[in-house]
From Swiss-Prot:
It is found in: Cytoplasm. It comes from the Bacteria. Homodecamer; pentamer of dimers. Its cofactor is Mg(2+). The lineage of its organism: Bacteria, Bacillati, Bacillota, Bacilli, Bacillales. Its EC number is 2.1.2.11. This is 3-methyl-2-oxobutanoate hydroxymethyltransferase.
Length: 277
């Protein structure tokens, strides 16, 4: 299993880091079999697998539950777990307690926090306490309720400079890596070159040190539309729907199950059960 020191070495050598967001045992198992470097258990599970319209309702217990499943499916892969909405915006002590609970109960190797500002101090204190932290800048889904959209961030000079400053701040605070989401590729390249820690891009161009996409987006499973930055590697939904429809139809028509799908009992045992005729 790769560790932060390995990710630093990969950045240094130019080898790209692969991260996939997964939420359960079978998807994590697939990800590990594909030899991805990291798994992110994102609070996006709220929308992708729990059916919420945002990440806001996701709880610590949700994150622990899904991370434990991921760990069982990918025991040899570095796992990062999101700290959900408002679990790191109270006191430092509350933040440390919440991170401790996630790491101890789920087995996550690191936690991810969105944003900068007051979050920078939380990253520093978590690092001091021994909890590895991945930062997340650019489009931060937990704050969409305030910003009102999932549009590209940091397109103006002022916003771009602020993002660069924030990236340097979270690095100085001890973050082991930074997710850069939905920012101009030129800015992502500048940030990547300015930092000694790895950058993991999603909708941030090719020059970041690594890339992350959601498992469901990659394989086309249960999604209504793909974002611009998502490449369609498969479309599993096209296979799933007709398969389920065929099953329902065959049961109704009594063409499933066939004899070959059934178990049998020896004739002698049947006679013993029902009596000899």
């Amino acid at each position: 299993m790769k560790r932060p020191v390995d990710f630093y070495a990969m950045k240094e050598s130019g080898e790209k880091i692969t991260m996939i967001t997964a939420y359960d045992y079978p998807s994590a198992k697939n990800v590990e079999q594909a030899a991805a470097d990291m798994i992110l258990v994102g609070d996006s599970l709220g929308m992708v697998v729990l059916g919420y319209d945002s990440t806001v309702p996701v709880t610590i217990d949700d994150m622990i539950h899904h991370t434990k499943a991921v760990k069982r499916g990918a025991p040899n892969t570095f796992v990062v777990t999101d700290m959900p909405f408002m679990t790191y915006h109270g006191s430092v002590d509350e933040t440390i307690q919440n991170a401790r609970q996630i790491i101890q109960e789920s087995g996550a190797h690191a936690v991810k926090l969105e944003g900068a500002g007051e979050v920078v101090n939380k990253i520093a204190r978590l690092t001091e306490a021994g909890a590895p932290v991945v930062a997340h800048l650019g489009l931060t889904p937990q704050s969409v309720g305030l910003t009102g959209s999932y549009k590209v961030r940091a397109k103006s000079v002022q916003e771009a400079q602020e993002l660069i400053d924030n990236a340097l701040a979270v690095e100085a605070a001890g973050a082991i890596a930074i997710v850069l989401e939905a920012i101009p590729r030129q800015l992502a390249e500048k940030v990547t070159k300015a930092l000694t820690i790895p950058t993991i891009g999603i909708g941030a161009g090719v020059e970041t040190d690594g890339q992350v996409l959601v498992y469901h987006d990659i394989i086309g499973y249960g999604i209504s539309r793909r974002a611009k930055f998502v490449k369609a590697y498969a479309d599993i939904d096209e296979t799933i729907e007709p398969a389920l429809t065929s099953y329902v139809k065959e049961v109704k028509e009594q063409t499933f199950p066939e004899v070959k799908h059934s178990f049998t009992m020896a004739e002698e045992d049947l006679k013993g059960l029902y009596g000899r005729e």
